[in-house]
Amino acid sequence: IELTVHDCEFGEAPRHIGLLHHLLYVGRIGRFEIRGSRLQGGFRGHLIKSRARLNHIHANFAVDDETGEASYELDLPNGGVAWVVGNVFGQAARTQNPALVAYGAEYDPHADSLLVMAHNTLVNRAASDQAEFVKVWRDRLPAAAEVILSNNLVFGPGRFDGSAWAGSI
């Protein structure tokens, strides 16, 4: 099964305490593509959550606005192959989670796991000393899993994958 989303807008998640309303949730399918779309106004859930084996996430604007309280802006909980290129991800000051992008957070990963993030802009407006632009759960992914981060622009405090602070710009 494949899902393709082009030039769509998702926003203003319901504000029900105790429930997780993801703006876009993709189950465990073969392929997911989202391109040229806008996601904002999350509440406790993630802006994009995909369990697909293959993900193409290109040229999207996934920025939680001032009233937003989203958790992750992008969650790929089961790993898989993900090409994340040319997006803008932005975390609101009232975020529910210190990471913008999460990879492999849950168990039962895909056998082939590769995250390539290039030419993205990541903005952290949360004033947390725990902020992470990209968080990878290596202990939950296959041993051969790869993560390639290249030419990403960051604004605000944060680090990548538990490493030393990337700094504040």
Regions found by a protein language model. Give the residues of each.
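Glycine- and acidic/polar-rich repeat regions and solenoidal domains
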Residues: 1-169
